[in-house]
Amino acid sequence: MSKLWGGRFTEEAEAWVEEFGASISFDQQLVNQDINGSIAHVTMLAKQGIVTKEEAEKIKIGLQYLLEEAKQNKLNFSVEAEDIHLNIEKMLIEKIGEVGGKLHTGRSRNDQVATDMHLYLKEKVEHIMKATKQLQTVLVHQAENNIETIMPGYTHLQRAQPISFAHHILAYFWMLERDVNRYEDSLKRINISPLGAGALAGTTFPIDREYSAELLGFNGIYENSLDAVSDRDFILEFLSNSSILMMHLSRFCEELILWSSQEFQFIEMSDQYATGSSIMPQKKNPDMAELIRGKTGRVYGNLFSLLTVMKGLPLAYNKDLQEDKEGMFDTVKTVEGCLHIMAGMLETMTVNKEKMGQAVTQDFSNATEIADYLASKGLPFRQAHEIVGKLVLHCTQKGIYLVDVPLETYKEMSSLFEEDLYEVLSPYAAVKRRNSAGGTGFEQIEKALEKAKGLTKEAIKN
């Protein structure tokens, strides 16, 4: 077929060259955005008198027809037409005649594709924010059901201090809240229009960029045409924000994988989110959590790939920028899928409160409580730390725990020890006493839950 840009050429490209350079296999995902962008563009052209109202109306009717066909997956794209833009333009001309060729007046594929991606990411970021809020709602429900579920808190993957399981869950709620805030802030950069920037230098036609931006729901326009067509910061920012979100999901999945093991037995995954072994009949594998952990690397790769593509590109457009889309599409699909699976996995998991409780009583995670006890009686904390360290050594040598040590032994270490010492050794009491702002104390958890519920309700309303 003859190319829409073929006037300057005397030889046709080999079929394999056409296939290598074509992007329609993946950029067809922008079909709705491309058509909507064209409808706004031709509406602006008519307003400015660049095309007649009759011509614009005919073009819009043709575009609306193609949009309906696209929604029903009835459009047949061709590699020969290269990309989504030329495919749509070719179909439009076939549908309404040569007047369809006027659609591209005052526009280049460079600003056209940038506009498509801005529209696409605006929609997808809002979807991801909503899905993240739904996951946060699941976390709030689990936290509400586990305020008084006591578990070991860890540092270096060693038992450190008793905490509420709700407190642990809410840590991820606040990580996700930052993720939502990052996505929301990125919309300021996504929601601006490059349409009308042309190939790189603007256009000689008297277009109204602000009007077409308004029609598409953008908050403003790029102030520099070179920047408009060469900018991919908004995609990089999306990929970066998504990488951070996936890192948070991956960290949580790592813990879920550990907790579901026989060594921990803190939780049990629902059968819906686990698989078995083809050879070992006893196995129940946390495959969904492992997949989310694994797919995190995939999202990282998409970010690093585009950063590498962009680092050496001179202004303005270069064909290298065709490589900006597949990683973006893949990240959207991956993040949306992981958020959905994560919400279902957490909603259906069973918490083994008894095992968590056993873990926190058969360890030395209450050692800090004794140090704080001595410090509250006036002993410098460093001296208290030394005394408790010796007590722990004594216990490990005897094969006992701090709660088993008789008061006489405590008094040999320090005269400040009294009978009330045993009250602070209870894991429940240890958690309850940590009532500083943001701490694991039950009162603080209740306050945190109120804030969290307010944030999720507000998001649902919006």
UniProtKB/Swiss-Prot annotation:
GO BP field: arginine biosynthetic process via ornithine; L-arginine biosynthetic process
Main location (coarse class): cytoplasm
Keyword terms: Amino-acid biosynthesis, Arginine biosynthesis, Cytoplasm, Lyase
Entry EC no(s): 4.3.2.1
Localization annotation: Cytoplasm
Reaction catalysis annotation: 2-(N(omega)-L-arginino)succinate = fumarate + L-arginine
InterPro entries per UniProt: Arg_succ_lyase_C, Argininosuccinate_lyase, Fumarase/histidase_N, Fumarate_lyase_CS, Fumarate_lyase_fam, Fumarate_lyase_N, L-Aspartase-like
Pfam families: ASL_C2 (PF14698), Lyase_1 (PF00206)
GO molecular function: argininosuccinate lyase activity
Pathway this chain belongs to: Amino-acid biosynthesis; L-arginine biosynthesis; L-arginine from L-ornithine and carbamoyl phosphate: step 3/3
First-level EC class: lyase
GO cellular component labels: cytosol
Family: Belongs to the lyase 1 family. Argininosuccinate lyase subfamily.
Protein name: Argininosuccinate lyase
Organism: Bacillus cereus (strain ZK / E33L)
Gene: argH
